[in-house]
């Protein structure tokens, strides 16, 4: 049995190294795409940025805009950097998802508490190095 993906959560990508550029970039997303900014984004001291809300989805997929240049302060290494461009998926059960990744021989790493006290994010790469994130919600 494979992962039980419930939907796309977000796509995260870097927007440069200067936090003072965030308002102008946010304005671009608001004005060009008519998208709202998620006001519930927590302050992440090591990753300034914004979450752009996308419409018409139960999970409400987002663009995560992250300020970073080179390896981010939140990273454990260049490879294990949560600010790398990635696709985040919502899964039904994160424990089962990790078991499945282990069963199929996929190495992963976990960030706990990065975006909230009880948050767990599982990251792994596809064979070509594209980064994926798994989270369980509700």
What spans do the regions from the language model cover?
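Vicinal oxygen chelate
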Residues: 1-9, 40, 98-138
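N-terminal beta-strand motif that seeds the catalytic metal site of vicinal oxygen chelate
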Residues: 1-26, 85-87
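Helix N-cap motif at beta-to-alpha junctions
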Residues: 18-19, 91-95
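Amphipathic alpha-helical segments
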Residues: 20-37, 104
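Conserved short beta-strand elements that form part of the metal-binding/catalytic scaffold
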Residues: 36-78, 124, 131-136
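Exposed loop/turn and edge beta-strand positions of beta-sandwich/beta-sheet ligand-binding modules
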Residues: 46, 83, 118
